[in-house]
Amino acid sequence: EIGSTIPNATFAYVPYSPELEDHKVCGMPTSFQSHERWKGKKVVIVAVPGAFTPTCTANHVPPYVEKIQELKSKGVDEVVVISANDPFVLSAWGITEHAKDNLTFAQDVNCEFSKHFNATLDLSSKGMGLRTARYALIANDLKVEYFGIDEGEPKQSSAATVLSKL
C-alpha cells in the first residue's frame, strides 16, 4: 500500500569487486537489513522470479543497467535487484549483466520481503520452488511510493515505468 512502511527484511548478497569479473573468483556473501540500509534513502527494488531466466535476463534487468544514471539523477540512492536465488548466483548474474557496482543483486531470503506484499510465485511445478513475483517498488525513507506488479512481460515493473513514477 502506498505510504506504508516496507518490512524490515534480511537480504543476502555478494558485494561487487572487480576481481569477480574473472568468473573463476567467488565472492563471500554478506547480509543487510532493509531498515538499516535504506533509512533516509530513495531505493528502487526490482523483483524477478529468477536469475538467468529468459524474460528477466533479456527484458527486465538490462534497462535498469542502461538507465542507472537517469535513475540516480532523479534522486535514487540505490537500485536493488532481488530474487529467491542464492547470493552466489545473483552475483554471477550481475557480472553477466555488466552491472558492476551500479546495482545490487540480492537474495530476498526466504522471500520474506516479497511475502509482505503478497508478491510470491509457487513455481514448484517447474522445479523452482517459491520465488519472488515480477515487481518494482520505490521506497523513500522506508515508505512505499510506488508498487507495480506484472504477471508476464515487464510493464508496471519496467525501468521506463519506474522512471515515470520518480
Swiss-Prot record:
Would you tell me the Gene Ontology cellular component terms?
mitochondrion; peroxisome
Its EC number is 1.11.1.24
Which reaction is recorded as catalysed by this protein?
A: a hydroperoxide + [thioredoxin]-dithiol = an alcohol + [thioredoxin]-disulfide + H2O
- Database matches in CDD domains: PRX5_like (cd03013)
Q: Where is the active site?
A: 56 (cysteine sulfenic acid (-soh) intermediate)
Q: Name one GO biological process term.
A: cellular response to oxidative stress
Subunit structure of this entry?
Answer: Homodimer; disulfide-linked, upon oxidation.
The UniProt function text for this chain reads:
Thiol-specific peroxidase that catalyzes the reduction of hydrogen peroxide and organic hydroperoxides to water and alcohols, respectively. Plays a role in cell protection against oxidative stress by detoxifying peroxides and as sensor of hydrogen peroxide-mediated signaling events.
Give the record's family classification.
Belongs to the peroxiredoxin family. Prx5 subfamily.
* Annotated PANTHER family: PEROXIREDOXIN, PEROXIREDOXIN-5, MITOCHONDRIAL
Q: What is this protein called?
A: Putative peroxiredoxin
Origin species = Malassezia furfur
